[in-house]
Amino acid sequence: NPDILCLQETKVSNNDFPLKAFEDLGYEVKFSGQKSYNGVAIISKLAIEDFKVDFLGELKENIVSKEYLKQKRIISAFINGVRIINVYVPNGSSLNSEKYEYKLKWLEYLSKYINKQKERNELTCILGDFNIAPTHLDIYDPKKYENGIMASVPEREALKKILKNEFIDAFRVFEKGSGFWSWWDYRKNSYELNRGWRIDLIYISKNLLPNLKSSVIANDERANEQPSDHAPIIINLNFDEKYEEYDSDDDDLFAI
């Protein structure tokens, strides 16, 4: 029962998004999708303001190649005083593929996007499926997978460039060690054997850190019948008296 729900890889066109199902539960919904591939959505009990779609939400058209606007992978909105940026980063396939080069260029555009957004000095939350394990601690078998796809030096350096020591991995505020995964391959009984990666991430701006109360991976959801191969990541933020217009069952807490 989150206050804000962010989805990635919705795989439906805008016309086919199950809008009514969420509206019947009291949510406002914004999304950007395409048939069979990609797609992102922000679903909120709180009012969604200043909704932006694609890289053109922050960047001028002459900066972004049209090739990087076709895939629906990024949206943002201003909700309850926080800028929510929801991303579905390309997987990259393999290090010698064109998809890998596409991924690195996409991350370069994301860096420019975040730099532009930061000019407004908003409380900010960047989240989604990053398809990058930030460190060796985020892979069940780093000796096997380090320097491969989702764990290569260029990918990690691109992620660091985006964050620039100005954003904090919310989960790592509470859990420092290894053994915490958000994604398990459908193949080879990966979930049953707990062979996972932590590639679904929530980053918060430093000015939002005092409001962060918890961050968990709901990995039990992966055990459901016909589950996603990803588990939900949840954070709770507390704004005390700051946003008195928001009235919820949890007082001043809201969950993403």
Give short role names for the model-derived ranges:
Residues 36-51, 190-211, 237:
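Conserved beta strand-loop-helix elements of the APE1-like EEP
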Residues 1-15, 84, 113-136, 170, ...:
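Active-site beta-strand/loop signature of hydrolases that rely on acidic residues for catalysis
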Residues 14-16, 39-40, 93-96, 133-143, ...:
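Short catalytic/ligand-binding loop motif for oxyanion handling, primarily in non-cytosolic enzymes
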Residues 9-13, 17-94:
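Structured beta-strand-rich core segments of catalytic domains in phosphoester-bond hydrolases
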Residues 83-100, 142-155:
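Active-site-proximal loop/helix segment associated with metal-binding centers of metalloenzymes
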Residues 25, 106-199, 247-256:
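Metal-dependent phosphoesterases centered on the DNase I-like endonuclease/exonuclease/phosphatase
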Residues 216-256:
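Surface polyanion/phosphate-binding segment centered on an Asp-His-Pro turn
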Residues 55-56, 169-178, 215-219:
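Acidic carboxylate-rich catalytic motifs and surrounding loops in phosphoryl-/glycosyl-chemistry enzymes
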